[in-house]
Swiss-Prot record:
Classification via SMART domains: TLDc
Protein name: Restriction of telomere capping protein 5
Keywords assigned: Cytoplasm
Record organism: Talaromyces marneffei (strain ATCC 18224 / CBS 334.59 / QM 7333)
Similarity comment text for this entry: Belongs to the RTC5 family.
Gene this chain is encoded by: rtc5
């Protein structure tokens, strides 16, 4: 952005190179504040290489500045990281592609000049809205292109007829035409349409410059001849980096997330990355990930996957070289020797950020890597991920700490008046329970658990997807079932029989199931926790040995819609039911990716409920912490009330009539029916959310 790069004059720019520079200038002036731009220039020019007046960054400078492990340049003394976390080449590849925006097909890979880096930061931090007003806030296609290898597809007939030796020869030929360190996947034509879903960002950029014709010229690459795929090795390296830095906050040190990881932490990060990769087909894992599959998986089941790149590249907007207490001149024109790169020291005592609050138990399921995995798709009221919305997770219930009693479950969970996450971990019946055989699944419950039937609340914004439930599987393969949007727009007539969550001491926990009318009628008109006369009669006769009448079976929850989860009353087994034939009915929409079996049976090893504490924007602005913990204080108040009520019940004296045993039993039965004393005072018949 100097005199040599000026595009001013009577003639408007007409070449891709000139238009690219002009777009960078607009990005710089409209997407950054003057202070941010000053810091950006200092960071770039103080580290840039100089070749005959041409200033640029190479891969080593980029990796060192961002504190990203790079196996090519990282010294052994900086070790303590897994080689598979060496994402430096992947990030450099992405940046070189994005720096050529919007002419990636003719100018990529670009040299990392200041103009190129401006476009990179704007695109990866999603600041382009001020310039590209018609640009859709969707970078999926652009990011796919930055990761994908482009090669000439093998025809189906040749793919089937030729032997493995000829295939290897073709692979070797194509590999020689690409950058070292990245494999090019040779694959059959997957009907990838180069022009499908036009790149809205690129079109908006060229429309703002009145240069659509130049853009069309740039697009004249035969989409029928060339196809693009992301190699699994490239995608795995990026996934491991994103999982490691998911908790990263703006201007927070990156090194505490990317270096000095223990072997257990490295294994945990790799495991989460592998579960995401396992969600693609075997053919894609072998030959490369297609755009259609990548776009659908990321957009629906991993909408926040690339969020960690925003705070990572925002480091370029703050320079430690600048001392704002005094004026500095010529900072942007200084030589590399005058401003050597400042190495960020690793603070051994500094711990990575965690959103898990201390409480009554430590999780046997959640690890930092698994929480990072959850942050890639779970919603938050702010529209951002779990980390960027400042959400905290409070331990509510654990079978390890509180036992497998539904009474204990009610005591801890039904008193939590905020959204929650249910996490179940186990293995298929008969398996040995090794880490590779573990199955981890769960549900996001946006409403507090309630002891009585209630319809869906629609007071929130109709576009607030954080108020939709989610059903998901984490291990061994990633798959998500988002909540049905109709839950926000209408009050479904079936809400009474298809609640999001149904709880019963008889049948257990049901999520997304249809509840038979007979089960609903037994508690419809008697209020929360108050058993109907029929229930009380059955309970009384069962305790008296009248099992013949009690054998009248109560029909349990019925799987309904695209997905349902049923947990038995002993919290010992769970069943995940998936349907790919259902329409728009049910609590959840179809699983994405569609790789789950129709029925999954697991023996439960651990079950945990984690409460979600969302920051109150009004209180947060004042700086207080009272409201953010209000759900915790409400739960404690409920426990104290229950304790007082239990003491009060102990003091109730039943004195009616002459005080005979018969009259005493009748009076006591009446109080039990009212839910005031006895087991029913603590064991409510059921409830739903």
């Amino acid at each position: 952005m100097g005199a040599g790069q000026s595009t001013g004059g009577l003639e408007s720019p007409s070449t891709p190179e000139q238009l690219s520079v002009l777009l960078a200038e607009r990005f710089a002036t409209k997407c950054f504040t003057p202070l941010e731009l000053t810091h950006f220039k200092d960071n770039f020019y103080s580290r840039a290489l100089d070749q005959a007046g041409f200033r640029y960054w190479n891969e080593k400078i980029l990796s060192d500045f961002l504190s990203i492990p790079d196996g090519i340049y990282t010294n052994e003394k900086d070790g303590g990281h897994d080689g598979r976390l060496d994402a430096g080449p992947v990030i450099f590849r992405m940046v070189s592609y994005l720096g050529a925006f919007p002419f990636q097909k003719t100018l990529a890979p670009s040299v990392l000049t200041f103009d190129a880096m401006v476009k990179v930061v704007v695109l990866l931090t999603e600041r382009y809205g001020k310039v590209l007003r018609r640009g859709r806030k969707d970078r999926v296609k652009l990011l796919f292109g930055s990761l994908a290898d482009v090669g000439r597809p093998v025809r189906q007939e040749e793919h089937n007829d030729e032997g493995s030796s000829s295939t290897k020869t073709e692979e070797a030929k194509q590999s020689s035409s690409h950058a070292q360190g990245f494999s090019v996947d040779v694959s059959v034509n997957d009907e990838y349409d180069e022009y499908e879903d036009d790149d809205d960002l690129a079109l908006a950029a060229l429309e703002s410059l009145d240069a659509i014709e130049v853009f069309k010229h740039d697009q004249r690459i035969d989409g029928a001849v060339y196809e693009a795929r992301i190699s699994v090795d490239t995608f795995r390296r990026l996934l491991m980096l994103l999982l490691a830095i998911a908790p990263l906050k703006p201007l927070e040190s990156v090194t505490k997330y990317t270096f000095n990881l223990s072997s257990e932490e490295q294994a945990a990060v790799k495991r989460e990355a592998d579960t995401i990769i396992a969600s693609f087909t075997e053919e894609e894992i072998r030959d490369g990930i297609r755009y259609k599959s990548f776009a659908k998986t990321v957009s629906i089941s991993l909408p926040h996957l690339f969020d960690p790149l925003t705070p990572l590249f925002e480091h370029l907007l703050f320079s430690k070289n600048l001392d704002l207490s005094r004026k500095q001149t010529g900072a942007s024109n200084a030589s590399p020797e005058s401003h050597p790169p400042i190495q960020t020291p690793i603070n051994e005592e500094e711990q990575p950020t965690t959103i898990m609050l201390p409480g009554s138990f430590e999780s046997a399921i959640l690890t930092p890597s698994l929480v990072s995995h959850l942050s890639f798709f779970l919603p938050a009221s702010s529209g951002q991920n779990l980390y960027r919305s400042d959400i905290r997770l409070h331990p509510v219930f654990s079978t390890v700490a509180h036992g497998e009693s539904l009474t204990s479950f009610q005591h801890n969970v039904f008193t939590w008046q905020a959204p929650s996450i249910l996490i179940v971990q186990g293995a298929a019946p008969g398996s040995s329970g090794t880490p590779d055989e573990l199955i981890t699944l769960g549900a996001y419950i946006p409403q507090p658990w309630k002891p009585s039937s209630s319809s869906w609340e629609t007071s929130q914004s109709l576009n607030d997807k954080s108020r939709l439930p989610y059903l998901f599987q984490i291990h061994p393969k990633h798959s998500v079932l988002p909540g049905n949007p109709s839950l926000l727009s209408t009050r479904e007539q079936s809400s009474a029989t298809t609640p999001t969550v149904y709880f019963s001491t008889t049948t257990g926990i049901a999520i997304g199931c249809e509840i038979p009318a007979s089960a609903q009628q037994q508690r419809t008109h008697y209020g929360p926790g108050v058993p109907s006369p029929r229930e009380h009669l059955q309970h009384h006769r069962q305790s008296s040995g009248g099992n013949s009448i009690h054998k009248q079976q109560q029909q349990g929850p019925i799987p309904h819609g695209a997905g349902s989860l049923i947990i038995d009353s002993g919290l010992e087994t769970a069943q995940l039911h998936i349907s790919y034939l259902t329409g728009s009915t049910g609590v959840f929409t179809r699983a994405v990716p569609p790789i789950l079996p129709t029925t999954t049976h697991i023996d439960i090893y651990n079950l945990e409920i984690w409460g979600i504490i969302e920051p109150d924007p009004l209180i947060a602005a004042v700086g207080g912490d009272t409201i953010s913990r209000d759900a915790i204080s409400q739960q404690r108040a409920a426990w104290q009330f229950d304790a007082r009520e239990a003491e009060r019940r102990k003091c109730i004296n039943v004195k009616l009539g002459s005080g005979t045993d018969s009259e005493y039993q009748n009076a006591r039965a009446l109080l039990e029916m009212a839910g005031i004393i006895g087991d029913q005072a603590h064991q409510r018949s059921g409830g739903s959310v």
